[in-house]
Amino acid sequence: MIKKTSRIHGWSEAKYWGFIRSCLRRAFQRYPNKYRTQASAKRVGGKYECNLCKKEFRAKDVAVDHIVPCGTLKSFEDLAVFADNMFCEIKGLQILCKACHKTKTLHERGMSDEDIKVSEFRKLPAKQQKEKLSMYINDVGKNQAERLKQYRELL
């Protein structure tokens, strides 16, 4: 099968729009409203309060989140909505700790709480998976597939 290419250097549509999306995300890093959101949320002592869990974090442990997701960017028709959502007003942005931001993003992508927990468990080294499971069951699975099944049953 011939790979569909329609852009410069033989890029596929997906690669081309991924590149455009990446450029827009990099531009957001310098967007004034991002800095204004951070500045207005800063507490005494340089800490920030997560808008979801309400705990305080250092600057390196928080992210500026779009309240309304930017959406997909897979074609020219998506570009205007994506850019409008990306470069929104300050009221469309919030400060989240990295853990809450990751969870919110995965929910927006359609993952359930259970799927997120299993995904995090899967990333643990085998030794830590076994330790975590051994607190609840006696016969811990010998391979990752068995341990994932056991973990999912515990949830």
Put a short name on every predicted segment.
Residues I2-K54, A80-E89:
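Short, charged surface segments at domain edges that flank catalytic/cofactor-binding sites
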Residues Y48, G71-E77, M111, I116, ...:
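Short coil/turn linker and secondary-structure boundary residues
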